């Protein structure tokens, strides 16, 4: 059985990590390269960089950053945010990103999923889905959760797999940033609809929440602030999960 993965997410703006971190032993906690290296050294399984600037003129900064990160870390890393076309996705992968995460662009042009998958393999395509319940149904939202697409989550999950995605990054809009726990109802809803790995996102606040996400059917759990502010220690989290019967990678912990 594949090990469950713990993923740290970094919001990057103009080549710097924003939303703050609390690592006293880092010279510069705003440097994504240094922070990425640090996370890879303490046992985080994967990194996600979200480019929240995501404008054309700032793209060069992100490309240079991806190259630097690729040289420094030895864990998979995904880049998302503002990837609107095949050219941008392609350039990020060629510069060293292991995967790209697409969201709004995939909804507006689903053929983009297929193009990236055919060129670089399904494993390089993560489709990020932001969803919440509307009138009793899980519905897909785009533009950072602002636009209700009217597309039902169940239909989009099936199409995403059919189009060639390798993974789904499932974010509960209602849980994001609350630290109230992952939306296990949504994870359980999506699990039987797809064979793709599901990354749970939105709501991590304590170690039990990771366990709940995995028990609900998630293959990976993503978090940001609980790691950045050291509210949860990666070693303790993995040992806790192992103790509760979850298969996690313990190599590389420190």
Curated annotation (Swiss-Prot):
CDD domains: HisF (cd04731)
Substrates-to-products reaction catalysed: 5-[(5-phospho-1-deoxy-D-ribulos-1-ylimino)methylamino]-1-(5-phospho-beta-D-ribosyl)imidazole-4-carboxamide + L-glutamine = D-erythro-1-(imidazol-4-yl)glycerol 3-phosphate + 5-amino-1-(5-phospho-beta-D-ribosyl)imidazole-4-carboxamide + L-glutamate + H(+)
GO terms classed as biological process: L-histidine biosynthetic process
Active site: 11, 130
GO cellular component, one term: cytoplasm
EC number(s) recorded for this UniProt protein: 4.3.2.10
Keywords: Amino-acid biosynthesis, Cytoplasm, Histidine biosynthesis, Lyase
Molecular function as annotated in GO: imidazoleglycerol-phosphate synthase activity; lyase activity
Matching SUPFAM superfamilies: Ribulose-phoshate binding barrel
Magnesium as UniProt keyword: no
Compartments reported by the entry: Cytoplasm
InterPro entries in the cross-refs: Aldolase_TIM, His_biosynth, HisF, IGPS_HisA/HisF, RibuloseP-bd_barrel
Pathway: Amino-acid biosynthesis; L-histidine biosynthesis; L-histidine from 5-phospho-alpha-D-ribose 1-diphosphate: step 5/9
Role of this protein: IGPS catalyzes the conversion of PRFAR and glutamine to IGP, AICAR and glutamate. The HisF subunit catalyzes the cyclization activity that produces IGP and AICAR from PRFAR using the ammonia provided by the HisH subunit.
Recorded family membership: Belongs to the HisA/HisF family.
PANTHER family for this protein: IMIDAZOLE GLYCEROL PHOSPHATE SYNTHASE HISHF, IMIDAZOLE GLYCEROL PHOSPHATE SYNTHASE SUBUNIT HISF/H IGP SYNTHASE SUBUNIT HISF/H
Protein name as it appears in the record: Imidazole glycerol phosphate synthase subunit HisF
Species this protein is from: Thermotoga petrophila (strain ATCC BAA-488 / DSM 13995 / JCM 10881 / RKU-1)
């Amino acid at each position: 059985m594949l090990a469950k993965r713990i993923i740290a997410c970094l919001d990057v703006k103009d080549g710097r990590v924003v939303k703050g971190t609390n690592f006293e032993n880092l010279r510069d906690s705003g440097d994504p390269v240094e922070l990425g290296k640090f996370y890879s050294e303490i046992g985080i399984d994967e990194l996600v960089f979200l480019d929240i600037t995501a404008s054309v003129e700032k793209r060069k900064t992100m490309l240079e950053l991806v190259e630097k990160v690729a040289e420094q870390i030895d864990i998979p890393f995904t880049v998302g945010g503002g990837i609107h076309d095949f050219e941008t996705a392609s350039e990020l992968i060629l510069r060293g990103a292991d995967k790209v995460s697409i969201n709004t662009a995939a909804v507006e042009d689903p053929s983009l999923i297929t193009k990236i998958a055919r060129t670089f393999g399904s494993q390089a395509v993560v489709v990020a889905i932001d969803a919440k319940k509307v009138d009793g149904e899980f519905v897909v939202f785009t533009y950072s959760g602002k636009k209700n697409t009217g597309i039902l989550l169940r239909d989009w999950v099936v199409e995403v797999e059919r189009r060639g995605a390798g993974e789904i990054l499932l974010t509960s809009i209602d849980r994001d940033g609350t630290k109230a726990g992952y939306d296990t109802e949504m994870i359980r809803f999506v699990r039987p609809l797809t064979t793709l790995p599901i990354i749970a996102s939105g709501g991590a606040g304590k170690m039990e929440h990771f366990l709940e996400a995995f028990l609900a059917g998630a293959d990976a759990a993503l978090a940001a602030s609980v790691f950045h502010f050291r509210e949860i220690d990666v070693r303790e989290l993995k040992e806790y999960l192992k103790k509760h019967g979850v298969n996690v990678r313990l190599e590389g912990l420190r």
